[in-house]
């Protein structure tokens, strides 16, 4: 039999949450190798982090694993809450209410990250979701758990907050504000950030011909590119120089990977075209041979 598993300490749980917020879910090796969390999580493995994160996700919604199992069996289909103006009555905490809890004897006195930050009240959940996606600054988008953890870290949340976040994310992705790709949410290409000015349409001149940019076939690609650029700029706004350099390096790596794939696809297309030409030549030669045999056959 293996050694009994050690109980997770508050410091380890806080480090795990902070690691997921920084690197995203599923990046267990990256979290363990990060110098910010490696010292606290030195006695944990990838499987430990994965199992603990699953337990945290369950208890964050239902309060306990037993309640979660019972709720999944008994919960009737609830009514949709798509009203964006529904205010959540949450009392804002002051700095005095956010004092760090004393650590247990023999434990490390570092405490959990971001423990002394004051939490704000929530008035519009959609704005808070936009803030979370923007501040998490994940180029591929943020998953639902990361968004909820950001809200939980910065706001005082009720027990059923995760369900509200899930409902709002589903609504925002259905109306086109957000795009959901592989369980991750990001701003859609036609999303205009608050405060961004939209330029009036202009006429483009090419020689003596005037083109109307309001036609979708002529200006659709330019508008789509502009909105995508605005969305990316809004995502990386406020990045430090190091974070911007890392984001640029990731973008370059993705572009190089896309170029490599395109080159491979082009080579495969050329190979298929050459094979098709060879097959066509062989078919013509076979047809000529057949006609020659028929013509010279002694009947």
Curated annotation (Swiss-Prot):
The keyword DNA-binding applies. Residues 28-57 bind DNA. The keyword RNA-binding does not apply. GO terms for cellular component: chromatin; nucleolus; nucleosome; nucleus. One of its GO terms (molecular function) is single-stranded telomeric DNA binding. One of its GO terms (biological process) is nucleosome assembly. Residues 243-288 form a coiled coil. Ubiquitous. Gene3D superfamilies: Homeodomain-like, Winged helix-like DNA-binding domain superfamily/Winged helix DNA-binding domain. Belongs to the histone H1/H5 family. SMH subfamily. This is Telomere repeat-binding factor 2.
């Amino acid at each position: 039999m293996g050694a009994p598993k050690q109980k997770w300490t508050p410091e380890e749980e806080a480090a795990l949450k902070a690691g997921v917020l920084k690197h995203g879910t599923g990046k267990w090796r990256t979290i363990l190798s990060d110098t910010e969390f490696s010292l606290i999580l030195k006695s944990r493995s990838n499987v430990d982090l994965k199992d603990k994160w699953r337990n945290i996700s369950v208890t964050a919604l239902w309060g306990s694993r037993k309640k979660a199992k019972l709720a999944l069996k008994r919960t009737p289909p609830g009514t949709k809450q798509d009203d964006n103006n529904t205010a959540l009555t949450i009392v804002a905490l002051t700095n005095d209410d956010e004092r760090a809890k004393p650590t247990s004897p023999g434990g490390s006195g570092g405490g959990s990250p971001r423990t002394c930050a004051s939490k704000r009240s929530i008035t519009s959940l959609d704005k808070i979701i936009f803030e979370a996606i923007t501040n998490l600054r994940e180029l591929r988008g943020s998953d639902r758990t990361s968004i909820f953890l950001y809200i939980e870290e910065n706001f005082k949340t009720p027990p059923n907050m995760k369900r509200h976040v899930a409902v709002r994310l589903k609504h925002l992705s259905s109306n086109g504000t957000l795009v959901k790709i592989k369980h991750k949410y990001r701003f859609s290409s036609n999303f205009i950030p608050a405060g961004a000015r939209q330029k009036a349409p202009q006429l483009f001149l090419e020689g003596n011909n005037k083109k109307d940019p309001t036609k979708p076939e002529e200006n659709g690609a330019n508008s789509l590119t502009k909105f995508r650029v605005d969305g990316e700029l809004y995502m990386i706004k406020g990045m430090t120089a190091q974070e911007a350099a890392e984001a640029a390096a990731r973008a370059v790596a993705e572009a190089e990977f896309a170029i490599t794939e395109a080159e491979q696809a082009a080579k495969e297309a050329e190979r298929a075209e050459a094979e098709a030409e060879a097959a066509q030549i062989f078919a013509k030669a076979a047809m000529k041979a057949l006609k020659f045999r028929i013509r010279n056959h002694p009947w």
